[in-house]
From Swiss-Prot:
The gene is rsmG. One of its GO terms (cellular component) is cytosol. It is found in: Cytoplasm. Keywords: Cytoplasm, Methyltransferase, rRNA processing, S-adenosyl-L-methionine, Transferase. Its EC number is 2.1.1.-. It comes from Clostridium kluyveri (strain ATCC 8527 / DSM 555 / NBRC 12016 / NCIMB 10680 / K1). S-adenosyl-L-methionine binds at G78, F83, A129, E130, R148. GO terms for molecular function: rRNA (guanine-N7-)-methyltransferase activity. It is an enzyme of class 2 (transferase). Coiled coil: none annotated. Specifically methylates the N7 position of a guanine in 16S rRNA. This is Ribosomal RNA small subunit methyltransferase G. Belongs to the methyltransferase superfamily. RNA methyltransferase RsmG family.
């Protein structure tokens, strides 16, 4: 089975449209990622097959959360090399996408990808999550927030929940053992105006992890997120 067939099968299983044009964008994205990775550390995953399975398909499987298909605006917080945001955009080109990262060199890379594979309505922002969440143009202004960033769920929730509209969702891509994090984060999520709605298992020969789905129930207090550095050093309890 070639790469197109692998990705097409995954998309069909999720009820998603996949075609040659979308596939070509993924392949060009892969090539740009490998080229830039020689100059800066974007990913430790460099084999073509692994990039497709561990980055692209892993990102596409966020669509196991079905309401994502109806989202009109998505922000990817701590996007790194563009995962899962850019694969989501390729699959769902009509969505408005914001890619947020704290390293400017990554933003330069992302802007190059967006230009090269001709993605429309994508904004790449250089900034810290806790700072940008206080700006009126981003705060409580997105249907869905996604993040594959490596951070404790309590910390990640304070970074991400302020970006969501009331009634919207935060999808945290977490590893296979997430029970303790969920237990520890419930009060913080409640303080921030959210509620854990679902935990979706993502499992096959390559994957074993969870999508933690948090729904925004009420507005986030202006107290949150707290200033840069405090969120990680003193997590909400």
């Amino acid at each position: 089975m070639d790469y197109f067939e692998i990705m097409d099968t995954v998309c069909k299983d999720l009820g998603l449209n996949f075609n040659q044009e979308k596939y070509n964008k993924f392949i060009k994205y892969k090539d740009i990622l490998k080229l830039w990775n020689d100059k800066m550390n974007l990913t430790a995953i460099v084999d073509d097959k692994d990039i497709i399975k561990k980055h692209f398909i892993d990102s596409i499987r966020v669509f196991k959360f079905l309401p994502l298909k109806d989202a009109k605006s998505i922000i990817d917080v701590g996007t790194g090399a563009g995962f899962p945001g850019i694969p989501i955009k390729i699959i769902k080109p009509e969505v408005k996408l914001i890619l947020l990262d704290s390293l400017n060199k990554r933003i330069k890379f992302l802007n190059q990808v967006v230009l090269s594979i001709k993605l429309n309505d994508v904004t790449c922002i250089h900034g810290r999550a806790e700072d940008c969440a206080r700006k009126i143009e981003y705060r409580e202004n997105n249907d869905v927030v996604v993040s594959r960033a490596v951070a404790n769920l309590t910390v990640l929730s304070e970074f991400c929940i302020p970006y969501i509209k009331v009634g919207g969702y935060f999808i945290a891509m977490k590893g296979p053992s997430v029970e303790d994090e969920i237990t520890e984060s419930k009060n913080a999520i409640n303080i921030l105006g959210g509620k854990i709605e679902d935990i979706i298992k993502v499992e096959d020969d390559e994957f074993n992890h969870n999508l933690v789905v948090i729904k925004k129930i009420t507005h986030t207090s202006d107290k949150y997120p707290r200033k840069a550095g405090i969120v990680s050093k003193n997590p909400l309890r």
